[in-house]
């Protein structure tokens, strides 16, 4: 049954959904990687598709920018459409010099300055972590594809234009691999509603060196990240 934000029916989505922030990237993923993809959502332009990858039913849908937006879609997919696993496939900014532009980062955990998980967890700190099997499958998929993926903590920021750039120094000290805006929220939603989640990000810009990819590149490239996500789903089916 349709929700206020998703005009699909039960069964339209696969049990695994890849979620980029940009709905146009979702369309690109469906057009490029899925066979027989059909549109299953277009409310507010947040495009969603379901197709098959090597015979396996998989969906892809945008989640927008920031924890409030992605939390709405993740919650509805899990509770109303039976989704069991969400893989965020997005971009992040690097804060460490040993992390390079276009590196693939697998978010084992997600720090955040958002209060949403504290709201869920009775004002205590909640360790927002990815599902271990999904992390392991993503690492194995990356190795099989010959992609060197970094695994560790990422930081989900509430503000894109931060008033406190010194926080980047703290992140670097604590070994944070990249900054994005959604993973901690998706991990929190998954934990609350009994699903599993993982964030795989490609470094789109470097906060230290000021290197960056273009908007067009972010929309239509980063194929290694998508291939890792898709192949990890197949590995999960074999477990």
Swiss-Prot record:
Record site: Important for catalytic activity: 218
Recorded GO MF terms: purine-nucleoside phosphorylase activity
Source organism superkingdom: Bacteria
EC top class, as a word: transferase
Keyword list, A-Z: Glycosyltransferase, Transferase
Binding-site residues for a purine D-ribonucleoside, renumbered to this chain: 5, 180-182, 204-205
Catalysis performed (reactions): a purine D-ribonucleoside + phosphate = a purine nucleobase + alpha-D-ribose 1-phosphate; a purine 2'-deoxy-D-ribonucleoside + phosphate = a purine nucleobase + 2-deoxy-alpha-D-ribose 1-phosphate
Residues that coordinate or bind phosphate: 21, 25, 44, 88-91
Matching InterPro entries: DeoD-type, Nucleoside_phosphorylase_CS, Nucleoside_phosphorylase_d, Nucleoside_phosphorylase_sf
This enzyme's EC code(s): 2.4.2.1
Record-linked Pfam families: PNP_UDP_1
SUPFAM superfamilies reported for this sequence: Purine and uridine phosphorylases
Keyword Glycosyltransferase: yes
Residues the record marks as active site: 205 (proton donor)
Biological process, per Gene Ontology: purine nucleoside catabolic process
GO cellular component term of the entry, any: cytosol
Subunit structure as annotated in this protein's UniProt entry: Homohexamer; trimer of homodimers.
Family of this protein: Belongs to the PNP/UDP phosphorylase family.
Free-text function comment from the UniProt entry: Catalyzes the reversible phosphorolytic breakdown of the N-glycosidic bond in the beta-(deoxy)ribonucleoside molecules, with the formation of the corresponding free purine bases and pentose-1-phosphate.
Identification of the protein by name: Purine nucleoside phosphorylase DeoD-type
Annotated source species: Erwinia tasmaniensis (strain DSM 17950 / CFBP 7177 / CIP 109463 / NCPPB 4357 / Et1/99)
